[in-house]
From Swiss-Prot:
Coiled coil regions, renumbered to chain: none
Swiss-Prot/TrEMBL keywords: ATP-binding, Cytoplasm, Ligase, Nucleotide-binding
GO MF annotation list: ATP binding; CoA-ligase activity
Domain notes: Both substrate-binding domains (SBD1 and SBD2) are involved in the substrate recognition, and are sufficient to confer the substrate specificity.
Stretch list, region SBD1: 269-338
Annotated positions binding ATP: 198-206, 338-343, 424, 436-439, 530
4Fe-4S keyword on record: no
Residue segments, region SBD2: 339-403
Name of protein: Probable CoA ligase CCL7
Major subcellular location class: cytoplasm
Subcellular location: Cytoplasm, Cytosol
Native source species: Humulus lupulus (European hop)
PANTHER family for this protein: 4-COUMARATE--COA LIGASE-LIKE 7, LONG-CHAIN-FATTY-ACID--COA LIGASE
Gene, per the UniProt record: CCL7
Tissue: Mostly expressed at low levels in glandular trichomes (lupulin glands) after flowering and in flowers, and, to a lower extent, in stems, leaves and cones.
């Protein structure tokens, strides 16, 4: 095997220590998360940054036990689906784990969804019960399903409580009676624990089936570096949505199973994030590229003491080298690193090793322990060696079981050898570091050349007067497609279209040059921080 991890069989293998998974095949992800909690019962597990409500690990476990019995008393049975439709709060992980501990399957949904969008997920997943907040009740009442109201205002919702089938979180806990242990439910690690819907940036979202083993494996991969460093107590701020795999599996579940503290924040607010980092002495802040952009471009950052930060991690979309280096100046005593994962991989494929040695700034790091990969030629479907660009295929114990009720999509994504075809374009360098270039479907086809929008976007936001940018293909009779940019200027900027074109032209090959630049107020993005390129393309083409 080469130092890149590349073998003669065309497979890249992790260069990290082997992944040791629990041998008990009947272990649930809930039992796993609390396996060591008796060693630190009074340690804060969850803190609500909006209300300051705190649950110690002892209280957290006790509440999950009560909630799991509460769900059973409401008639929830093994393999039933329960929908969580709520913004972040400490009640979300409690309910998520309570659902799973009862033997049911948790599915989560974006609280910004319209009734129409939510209806599609309800129709697909067929939940028996909905967990939401009073503020969102109007969106779910038409489904006529039993509903649990959670959150700080749930006890003040007496008009809603008078409705049939509506209970509060307090009612759910009370239903359990005096219980002190989890329900007697038979589990296998291979059982389905959650149904998370992919963001659908390139089409209809699909239900990703994740098992107990997927969550357990992913959580160990994510926290391995902390274990190797012997770190005892870290504090993570979770403002990324818990309905998404990044907020749920990578930040919340993975860190709780290690005994770290997770601070829940209901919605993104840059100044509130900075205040909370200072107030709670946050050590780890995991973000998406738009937040890195905000941190580097906003002068408000200088008002706050961020010295507790040891680590800023970014995921969900590629992050350019220039932006990473700018962000690193904000945390001189910490490290800015990047990882790569997707819902289908329970959130992780690779992450940078930040424990010293040569940095490969701009890469998505080395394969996580237990993960294998291939870089496959888009044309020949043959595996490629280091420094060759192709589609990223991955496999390992964290890979999804498939798409819910969608065997055709499953077959197109997972092949007979267990490889998950990510649809992402990338390559490994000679040291085994993965570079994710872009989505294959989003490449701009210019006269036979392929132009990656993410590369141009990374260059654009490195300009001091550009706050954000998106690049999309525009139909062209001669070239097929040409790259055009939509740019958000900083306040008081006098930047012109020609200025932007020249800035890019001096850094790229001629076929990558921008043919048009339009200035806009904001770039459309999903809740997980991914650019909604498809929405913009459809809007632009409808006006041609």
């Amino acid at each position: 095997m080469e130092k890149s991890g590349y073998g003669r069989d065309g497979v890249f293998r992790s260069l990290r220590p082997p992944l040791v998974l629990p041998k008990d095949h009947n272990l649930s992800m809930v039992s796993f998360v609390f396996r060591n909690s008796s060693s630190y019962p009074q340690k804060p597990a969850l803190i609500d940054s909006d209300t300051n409500e705190t649950l110690s690990f002892s209280q957290f476990k006790s509440m999950v036990i009560k909630v799991s019995h509460g769900f059973l008393n409401l008639g929830v049975q093994k393999n039933d689906v329960v929908l969580i439709f709520a913004p972040n709060s400490i009640h979300v992980p409690v309910c998520f784990l309570g659902i799973v501990a009862s033997g049911a399957i948790a599915t989560t949904s974006n609280p910004l969804y319209t009734v129409s969008e939510l209806s599609k997920q309800v129709k697909d997943s067929n939940p028996k019960l909905i967990v939401t907040v009073p503020e969102l009740f109007e969106k779910v009442k038409g489904f006529n399903l039993p509903t649990i109201l959670i959150g700080p205002n749930s006890e003040d919702s007496s008009p809603l409580k008078s409705r049939a089938k509506v209970l509060t979180f307090h009612d759910l806990v009370t239903l359990s009676g005096p219980v002190s242990d989890f329900p007697m439910v038979d589990f296998k690690q291979s059982d389905t624990a959650a149904l998370l819907y992919s963001s659908g940036t390139t089409g209809m979202s699909k239900g990703v089936v994740l098992s107990h083993k997927n969550f357990i494996a992913s959580s160990l991969m994510v926290t391995m570096e902390q274990d190797q460093a012997g770190e005892m107590h870290n504090v993570f701020l979770c403002f990324l949505p818990m309905f998404h795999v990044f907020g749920l599996a990578i930040i919340t579940y993975a860190q709780l199973q290690r005994g770290n503290t997770v601070i829940s924040m209901a919605r993104f607010d840059l100044e509130k994030i900075l205040k909370d980092v200072e107030k709670y002495k946050v050590t780890h802040l995991w973000v998406v590229p738009p937040v890195i952009l905000a941190l580097t471009k906003n002068s408000i950052v200088k008002k706050y003491d961020l010295s507790s930060l040891k680590h800023i991690g970014s995921g969900a979309a590629p992050l350019g080298k220039d932006l990473m280096e700018e962000c690193a100046k904000i945390v001189p005593h910490g490290i800015v690193a990047q990882g790569y994962g997707m819902t289908e991989t329970c959130g992780i494929v690779s992450v940078e090793d930040t424990r010293g040695g040569k940095r490969h700034t701009g890469s998505a790091g080395m394969l996580s322990s237990g993960v294998e990969a291939q870089i496959v030629s888009v044309d020949t479907l043959k595996p490629l060696p280091p420094n060759q660009l192709g589609e990223i295929w991955v496999r390992g114990p964290n890979m999804m079981q498939g798409y819910f009720n969608n065997p055709r999509a499953t077959k197109l994504t997972i092949d007979k050898k267990g490889w998950v075809h990510t649809g992402d374009l990338g390559y490994f360098d000679e040291d085994g570091h993965l570079y994710v270039v872009d989505r294959i479907k989003e490449l701009i086809k210019y006269k036979g050349f392929q132009v990656a929008p993410a590369e141009l976007e990374g260059l654009l936001v490195s300009h001091p007067e550009i706050l954000d940018a998106v690049v999309i293909p525009f139909p062209d009779a001669d070239a097929g497609e040409v790259p055009v940019a939509y740019v958000v200027r900083s306040p008081n900027s006098s930047l012109t279209e020609d200025d932007v074109k020249k800035f890019i032209a001096g850094q790229v090959a001629s076929f990558k040059r921008l043919r048009k630049v339009t200035f806009i107020n904001s770039v459309p993005k999903s809740a997980s921080g991914k650019i909604l390129r498809r929405e913009l393309i459809q809007k632009v083409r409808s006006n041609i």
